[in-house]
């Protein structure tokens, strides 16, 4: 089988779409290496995160030929369709970025995934409107539409008027580095390297308004053990400088607060294991669901904002909070009782078996084969 992907955002961006595309294609390449996976993009962009993916023998990248002047038109029109057919592509998979209009009416097997069905993380309302318009067209073209969770599935059905039988949930998988073992002496080395406190709760992500960082700080501040700090891993933003730093002063957390710009990817699993817990104060976006899965697989206690999405992904292996003080009490109970902590971590580990690369690859290959079968039946 040869699968083509709309790879513009995967190659040129470092966002939720790019991350999902990388882990999906990596999972497929590892578990079904006899297939070929071709990423199509109008332009090339240096992206270090793609190095491991491009090292897979079954992964290829294709761009429009040099004589084609309007490369974006090639990507969104008939050009990419001709290229895909010429490369023997059996199924085309668009991820967030729409599906080329040239596939419309062709009965070409197509699949479309939306990591954020309403595109709330788009850069402004104009970009959001354009992305929703592309998604609406893609839903009409695609033979199967993929959501990452049941809430998003219902949103796709309601907002884009897609038939329920045509929308399927395919959960993402955890990052394969989460399974790496960490030598005991590495913890102290990393503590000195990144100047980390002895006991801390870790937040990893963007330091923006929508991340509910004040709630994260207030929850850590309310813990019964006042020697536990919060470490925020992410680059400083205007919101951080104007709001977060002021909140640190307001609740007197100067000595219990640490911000780190960047931790090397190879060190991230170890830092998660060092943390008393990983806190995820917003669970409404794809990136937050990735965090839950990765933190659980890394062996960290996970506490996250309560939501239907969070409970679907986190299962029995996480602490869910709506109220800051109740959340602090629940986390304190777990951290103070080794039996409760061990039971939670065991449940988290068992929960992540739903999110292995093999499970993701098997599910997606089943979908690719089903749309291919649908095409053959239609032709007969």
Where are these predicted regions, by residue range?
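Carbohydrate transferase catalytic cores enriched for Leloir-type hexosyltransferases
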Residues: 1-380
